């Protein structure tokens, strides 16, 4: 009987660990928490190619808010690449805010609504606390007379930081 109780307790207490490896994460997160609790993000981060930028952008005074859904395939694809890119240009982790959103694109502090999130992921860039640009869903640029054109994350990042 004692063995049965011990086995039950071990399985019961271990279940949340195994079931949460790809769970919906909501609220403020660190990169380590994201990777530990969601294997898709971690695997995509490991497989992301290192970036070779032709020019180093000026990141003095730059901070980034990343609002995303762990359930969202665009977030699973773009956020690991973005995190690797931000690391490659020397962005310190304390300048990057990761905010997990639920299926309604919101979270307990209502930041989905505050930041007017319509698509995930939404990446908001600030220079000295003033918003200077956004990437919504996938990297793209607006070309006059053409409309939105898909570009790489590097091109979109450089455009925002250099404008």
Question: Which sequence ranges carry the predicted segments?
Answer:
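Non-catalytic, surface beta->alpha helical segment in thiol-disulfide oxidoreductase systems
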Residues: 125-163
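Sec-dependent N-terminal signal peptides
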Residues: 4-15
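Thioredoxin-like thiol-disulfide oxidoreductase module
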Residues: 99-120, 125, 138
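Conserved helix-turn-beta segment immediately C-terminal to the redox Cys motif
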Residues: 58-63, 81-99
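Conserved redox-active cysteine motifs that mediate thiol-disulfide chemistry
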Residues: 69-78
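N-terminal leader/targeting and pre-domain segments
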Residues: 20-59
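Thiol-based oxidoreductase modules, predominantly thioredoxin-like and allied folds used
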Residues: 67-70, 93-107
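Stable alpha-helical elements in mature extracytoplasmic
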Residues: 78-81, 153
